Amino acid sequence: MIVGIGIDIIELNRIEKMIDGKLKFMERILTESERNVAKGLKGSRLTEFVAGRFAAKEAYSKAVGTGIGKEVSFLDIEVRNDDRGKPILITSTEHIVHLSISHSKEFAVAQVVLESSSR
């Protein structure tokens, strides 16, 4: 049973401005593991990576129903890729998490669906 749905869209140029020489933004948004991946990226690929993670984490917080804040922080949520490249969301939730991330020339968007783990 679906217990939550969240979606977020972010302008790539907004993220590009925030990461331009500002390590604090990356430390606030990305986990250590995500920052290690980001170190190997440059230019538009780095912007897409950070924007996708930002949107995924915002979408998750909306699906949970709290938003980013005291109960859920950016660093409580990690986005990884499975063996086939599919994004997966790592968090402490008991729910099954379905994540989709997409990019266009101007935007990154993510959708999260939370499913009850009991069948």
Curated annotation (Swiss-Prot):
Transmembrane segments: none annotated. One of its GO terms (cellular component) is cytosol. InterPro entries: 4-PPantetheinyl_Trfase_dom, 4-PPantetheinyl_Trfase_dom_sf, ACPS, P-Pant_transferase_sf, Ppantetheine-prot_Trfase_dom. The keyword Lipid biosynthesis applies. GO terms for molecular function: holo-[acyl-carrier-protein] synthase activity; magnesium ion binding. Transfers the 4'-phosphopantetheine moiety from coenzyme A to a Ser of acyl-carrier-protein. PANTHER family: L-AMINOADIPATE-SEMIALDEHYDE DEHYDROGENASE-PHOSPHOPANTETHEINYL TRANSFERASE, PHOSPHOPANTETHEINE TRANSFERASE. This is Holo-[acyl-carrier-protein] synthase. The gene is acpS.
